[in-house]
Every structure is written in structure tokens, then in C-alpha cells.
Amino acid sequence: MARRILVVEDEAPIREMVCFVLEQNGFQPVEAEDYDSAVNQLNEPWPDLILLDWMLPGGSGIQFIKHLKRESMTRDIPVVMLTARGEEEDRVRGLETGADDYITKPFSPKELVARIKAVMRRISPMAVEEVIKMQGLSLNPTSHRVMAGEEPLEMGPTEFKLLHFFMTHPERVYSREQLLNHVWGTNVYVEDRTVDVHIRRLRKALEPGGHDRMVQTVRGTGYRFSTRF
């Protein structure tokens, strides 16, 4: 599914150009021409990223970011400021308010797309990654599919995230606490033993292709994902 990007820009030529570039690069742009219409676009399906102009009819980009951060459902949506205000003080103010990056007009389409992808990699690594393959096991971050050879494997979303982390960090030992921080996040409280439950579920899901052996217990330390049995 294409990543949904909300383009908040009051100048129609710039907004249309940005939307065209996004479409050409596989994104799904959604347009907003002023502050109020941007707020009205904050509903399901939520945007994966927001391109936000500094100055808007009805309010400022800074005010819009503050609105995002007040709401639990929108506070984690990444924001790239798209504006003619290039002074250092303005850039710092935007970043300190909560913007994830800053691009100054005029800009090239290549730079715009590169910055969007860079922010998405930092915020949500699975959003832009290619298919990951190891020992006949493949994981597609975009379609959320896992295959053992040609056979699809069924697993829950937490097991998928756990497998994704393991496949991108193979041959390393991680404690339960480290896995909780990397997979569940630091703002979620769950017990260490929750990791054990999902490890068991992940192994069960990987059994059909014999890949359950890749999820290894390191006694007294934690878990490792390895091709060395």
C-alpha cells in the first residue's frame, strides 16, 4: 500500500508540483490548502508523513505542529517543514517544536523525495525497506508478508515486528529488555516475560519451513537470530 502523505501548502502551483512528484515516486498525496483543511484531514487513514508549509491561511505551521503533538493519535506522525524561511533561528524553532526535518524553497524533487525517505527510515524503518531474505525466509515490510520459500507464513503483528528486528540485526544477542525497547518501544510498559510469549509464538509461526531454529535462546542473556544452528 502506498504511503499516505499530507501536503499542507497554500500556494497551488507548489502544492500541485509536490503532489505530482510524490505520485511519481509511489506515494499517495493528500492536499490541504490552509490550516483548517489540514486539521480536517487528520483522520483515518492517518497520514504516514506531513509536508507542512510555515505560513498558512488561518494559522501557522508551528501552531499546526503543536496541535498534532497535543493529540495522542497524531503526535507521532513525522513532519517535514516546507518553507521559504531559511534562517537558522526559524529552522531551530521548527525542529524544537516537533518537526523532524526542514527543507527550504526552492528545492529539487530529488531532494524532497530523499528527505521524505530519510525521515521515514528514522521514524518507521519498515515503511521504505526492501524485501529481507535469509536462508529461504523472506519478509516484505510493505505488504507485511512472510514467506518460507513459496509458502506464506501466518503470524501476528507483534511477531512480525519481532522477526523484522531479528532479520535486520542477525547474529547478535539481545536481552529481553533490549528487545522490549526496540520492538515495543520505550513508552510502553510490558513485563520482560512478554518477550518469551511472543518468541514462542514466532517460533511456532516459523516451524512450517524449519526456520524456528533460527530464533535461538542464549542462556542467561536473551535471544539471537542466527543462520548457524
Curated annotation (Swiss-Prot):
Gene Ontology MF terms: phosphorelay response regulator activity; transcription cis-regulatory region binding
Post-translation changes: Phosphorylated by PhoR.
Positions carrying 4-aspartylphosphate: 53
Compartments in which it is found: Cytoplasm
DNA-binding region as annotated in the record: 129-227
Span of domain Response regulatory: 4-120
GO terms for biological process, alphabetical: phosphate ion transport; regulation of DNA-templated transcription
Keywords carried by this UniProt record: Activator, Cytoplasm, DNA-binding, Phosphate transport, Phosphoprotein, Transcription, Transcription regulation, Transport, Two-component regulatory system
SUPFAM superfamilies xref list: CheY-like
One CC-aspect GO term: protein-DNA complex
Function: This protein is a positive regulator for the phosphate regulon. Transcription of this operon is positively regulated by PhoB and PhoR when phosphate is limited.
NCBIfam families in UniProt: PhoB, PRK10161.1
Protein name: Phosphate regulon transcriptional regulatory protein PhoB
Species of the source: Shigella flexneri
